[in-house]
């Protein structure tokens, strides 16, 4: 009988710490529903004490998700833990994840605490968390750079207090596979009560070894939980990639001897959703979910795949949710056909009004674009769902622009400001620059444009463009996304979406990193 590997997803918490990846409550809910559909074991929905917005998102997700355990991060103090417990009350199954730094560097320079003080705070934090649930996780932050004797002492104490999961954090991505795997192994061997807890690994990708270190923690160290994010999303170089972990363990079950309960057909749809929401485009050569992951350019490889796919493919594209572009609907398709296709794609909308709005967007697109693909439908629904829940201080209405070779383009943008239509006009160094200048001529947001990117949703010259705009103001970074066959119109929509997020400010306490 094989062991079960627990998949702990922290896209909504650690992934969101990536600059520019902050999500609204509604965006978090959409991702959480996809993670549940994927059958993720544990969803870390956020850090409840960081802000009222994060508390509310965790509380709502806890009430909606039934098939995954919902978790909140909490620093090792009563206030944070109480806040996490309150946020998690609606959940059918929940976990409190508390942590404190244990490395000499962090204790001295950041916490300004002695080892004995850290030991006592860790022990008491777990004891307090156990008052709310018997599912308590403890992480020694910067565990991979901690003194072994002290680490063993702390972990033995928190297990004695009732911690059921011990998560060894390689917070700065310093570990290498053999050493990290042996660290986990040594801890399990030296701690007398280690058999009372499941050991977990949490690795960062600063040296490009997050996945390798995590797998070593499992194979060498005996860990049975991996903490990871969709697309490896996370601050600095990112976190361990969920899709790579899952497919490595499934594809090489002969080596790892572990079962994972993930529905792998949901991997690519979830990857695309996270990319669309955060604006972090997946690189084409990214394992499993990159556009080129199953592409073969070499003639020898193409010949082999045509004769027998397993000559050059160790997993099937359809097993992870890749589907060929497929024309599914046209301008004569009705509302019922549209609704049925959404159900087939596993896409849900919260209300009939959202469905009606999405259908009208579809009909408008069908009048302008001869071929409608699944990807087009997903983009329409994603944007419509975001608009339905977005605080629409600003609303795009229309755009016209004119340019001639050798002259600065001119743009005129009509948009709503709290229900009142205004018109902005301006010139710029290109049609997009002119469009943004036209919006700012009326808004005067004072924000800085950090990123502008365009991604074709499907192939061909009629493809919709998906534009991501990243704005920064007063240290706050937000993303806006817009889609349209007209790239300049998509750009205006994305810019206005980002402005709406800047307008609905939700300040967060910056947590210690785990």
Swiss-Prot record:
Subcellular location: Cytoplasm
Any Gene Ontology CC annotation: cytosol
Positions of Mn(2+) binding: 14, 202, 204, 239
GO molecular function, one term: acetyl-CoA C-acetyltransferase activity
Sorted UniProt keywords: Amino-acid biosynthesis, Branched-chain amino acid biosynthesis, Cytoplasm, Leucine biosynthesis, Manganese, Metal-binding, Transferase
Coiled coil region boundaries: none
GO biological process: L-leucine biosynthetic process
EC number: 2.3.3.13
Top-level class of the enzyme under EC nomenclature: transferase
Catalysed transformations (reactions): 3-methyl-2-oxobutanoate + acetyl-CoA + H2O = (2S)-2-isopropylmalate + CoA + H(+)
NCBIfam families linked to this entry: leuA_bact, PRK00915.1-3, PRK00915.1-4
Family from the record: Belongs to the alpha-IPM synthase/homocitrate synthase family. LeuA type 1 subfamily.
Task performed by this protein: Catalyzes the condensation of the acetyl group of acetyl-CoA with 3-methyl-2-oxobutanoate (2-ketoisovalerate) to form 3-carboxy-3-hydroxy-4-methylpentanoate (2-isopropylmalate).
Protein name: 2-isopropylmalate synthase
Organism, scientific name: Burkholderia lata (strain ATCC 17760 / DSM 23089 / LMG 22485 / NCIMB 9086 / R18194 / 383)
């Amino acid at each position: 009988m094989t062991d079960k590997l627990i998949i702990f997803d922290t896209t909504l918490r650690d992934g969101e710490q990536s600059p520019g990846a902050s999500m609204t409550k509604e965006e978090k809910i959409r991702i959480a529903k996809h993670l549940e559909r994927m059958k993720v074991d544990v969803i870390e929905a956020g850090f409840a004490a960081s802000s009222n917005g994060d508390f509310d998102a965790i509380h709502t997700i806890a009430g909606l998700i039934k098939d995954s355990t919902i978790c909140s991060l909490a620093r090792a103090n009563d206030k944070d833990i109480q806040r996490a417990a309150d946020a998690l009350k609606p959940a059918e199954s929940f976990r409190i994840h508390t942590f404190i730094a244990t490395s000499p560097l962090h204790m001295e320079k950041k916490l300004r605490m002695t080892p004995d003080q850290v030991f006592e705070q860790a022990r008491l934090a777990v004891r307090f968390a156990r008052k709310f649930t018997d599912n308590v996780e403890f992480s020694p932050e910067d565990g991979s750079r901690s003194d072994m004797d002290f680490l063993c002492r702390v972990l033995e104490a928190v297990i004695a207090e009732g911690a059921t999961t011990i998560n060894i954090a390689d917070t700065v991505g310093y570990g290498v596979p053999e050493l990290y795997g042996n660290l986990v192994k040594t801890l399990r061997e030296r701690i007398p009560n280690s058999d009372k807890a499941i050991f977990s690994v949490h690795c960062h990708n600063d040296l490009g070894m997050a996945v390798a270190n995590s797998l070593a923690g499992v194979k060498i160290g005996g860990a049975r939980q991996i903490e990871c994010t969709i697309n490896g999303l996370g601050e600095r170089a990112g976190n361990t990639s969920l899709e790579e972990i899952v497919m490595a363990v499934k594809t090489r079950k002969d080596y790892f001897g572990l079962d994972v309960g993930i529905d792998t057909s949901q991997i690519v749809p979830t990857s695309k959703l996270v990319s669309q929401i955060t604006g972090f485009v997946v690189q084409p050569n990214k394992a499993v979910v990159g556009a080129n992951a199953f592409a073969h350019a070499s003639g020898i490889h193409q010949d082999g795949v045509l004769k027998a796919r397993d000559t050059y493919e160790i997993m099937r594209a359809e097993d992870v949710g890749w589907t060929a572009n497929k024309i599914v609907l046209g301008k004569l398709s009705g509302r019922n056909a549209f609704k049925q296709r959404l159900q087939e794609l596993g896409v849900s909308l919260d209300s009939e009004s959202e469905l009606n709005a999405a259908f009208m967007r579809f009909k408008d697109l069908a009048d302008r674009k001869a071929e409608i693909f699944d990807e087009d439908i997903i983009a329409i629904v994603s944007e419509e769902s975001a608009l339905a829940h977005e605080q629409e201080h600003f609303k795009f209405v229309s755009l016209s622009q004119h340019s001639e070779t050798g002259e600065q383009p001119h743009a005129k943008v009509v948009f709503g400001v709290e229900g009142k239509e205004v018109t902005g006009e301006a010139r710029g160094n290109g049609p997009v620059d002119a469009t943004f200048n036209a919006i700012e001529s009326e808004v005067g947001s004072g924000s800085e444009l950090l990123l502008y990117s365009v991604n074709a949703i499907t192939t061909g010259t009629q493809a919709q463009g998906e534009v991501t705009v990243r704005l920064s103001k007063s240290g706050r970074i937000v993303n806006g996304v817009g889609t349209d066959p007209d790239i300049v119109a998509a750009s205006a929509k994305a810019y206005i979406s980002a402005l709406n997020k800047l307008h609905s400010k939700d300040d967060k306490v910056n947590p210690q990193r785990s």
